Amino acid sequence: MSSITRDGQPALRAGVRLQYDRARDQWVLLAPERVVELDEIALVVAQRYDGTRSLAQIAQELAAEFDADAADIEADVIELTATLQQKRLLRL
């Protein structure tokens, strides 16, 4: 498994998609034979996993959008990314 860095450009793995689940009334990541529920924060991060933006860029966008500390946001983005990568939902 590769190390997560602020320069990583995550994208959802093939077969994984972001979808609103009406039964659960929330956004989820759908993967073969599993569903990962996303809270509001995880959703705004996951929506930016496009394979072109670095984690640092994602954090800067979110810090500007929510008027929050960029370093705190970056740490949270990296932590979420590491968790989703461990679940084999992302490629870097």
From Swiss-Prot:
Biological process terms in GO annotation: pyrroloquinoline quinone biosynthetic process
InterPro entries: PQQD, PqqD_bac, PqqD_sf
Protein name in the entry: PqqA binding protein
Keyword Metal-binding: no
UniProt-listed HAMAP family: PQQ_syn_PqqD (MF_00655)
Function as written in the Swiss-Prot or TrEMBL entry: Functions as a PqqA binding protein and presents PqqA to PqqE, in the pyrroloquinoline quinone (PQQ) biosynthetic pathway.
GO molecular function: quinone binding
